[in-house]
Every structure is written in structure tokens, then in C-alpha cells.
Amino acid sequence: MAAKILIVTGDAAESLEVLYPYQRLREEGYEVHIAAPTRKKLQFVIHDFEPGFDTYTEKLGYTWPADLSFAEVDPGAYVALVIPGGRAPEYLRNDLELRKILKAFFDADKPVAQICHGPLLTAAVDSLSGRRVTAYPALELDMQAAGATFQDAEAVVDGTLVSARAWPDHSAWMREFLKVLRSKAPVN
């Protein structure tokens, strides 16, 4: 039986940051589940960079069903965790069930991949202090406030934690995460 990886997300997550790791990890042979506050069809969004705007723009993206709710997750059944960005982490960081999941993965030193605004979740459970991370560049101060050393790079690896800035960095992010997975949490 293939090892299982959990993606935690919600409405307004960045479509590419959910679906790229979902597909890439399945290609590697992992079983991948998506968890959200409740089992429902999630509405993802697409962020883009357009001329004349000082920040990214947002449009409706894909919809995708959540396989299970946060309350249904048994962290012990999963070998790794993926935390996409978008706006979802802004409100998900207040979800107590999700906070329990995040703490369990970090307490067990399991591989965690986070991208864009995803590090807001790991900061909310005090799991970044003393670590090197990257995130969407506008979160540099948030990362420093969480005790992390912010690095503006495509992908940053600190032990079992792999972070990236945003979807343009997918290749470097997944390449580094797969190295960690092959070492710490192989498919079989």
C-alpha cells in the first residue's frame, strides 16, 4: 500500500498550489488526500501578476472536493503534509482542529511542504522559530515575527521543512520536497 500524504486547504486557496503538488505526488506513487474545515466542494482561486497593479490579482479558479474534514484526520496515518497558499491560510490558522494536525506533524518531525501564504499556518502553531524559510515576499515580516530567518529563494530546505515563495517556484519546491520524501518517507 502506498504511503499517504495530506494536503490541508480551504476555499480561496491558490488553484495551482493545491493541484500541482496533488498531481505531482500522485505521479510519484503516493496516495494524496485533501482535508478542509468540512467535506465539501472547495472553491479555489487564481492569483496572477498584471501590469499596473501593485499586488497580485485574484480570479475564480477550479473547484475540487475535500476528501475529509480536519476533524476526521488522523495525522498518524500520513507520512507528510502539504500546505498550499492563497488566501485560505489567513482564516484557516484560526481552526483548532487544523492546529492540532499541524502540531502533530511538527512534533513527529514529518516532512512538510509549504508555499506562498501557507507559512501563516505553521507560524500560528509556533513551528518556525529558529528555522530558515521562504514565503510570499510580503510575508517576510510575519516570518521574522514568528522567529524564522526569511530567505528570498525559490525553495528553502530546513530539515524536513521545505518552503517556496509562490507557484512560479513549483519546480524547485517539489524537487526539494521529493528529495526529503525519498529519504524520510518513501512511497512504500
PLM feature spans:
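Extended, subdomain-level signal for the structured scaffold at the beginning of enzyme domains
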Residues: 1-108, 112, 121-130, 140-188
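Anionic-ligand binding patches
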Residues: 133
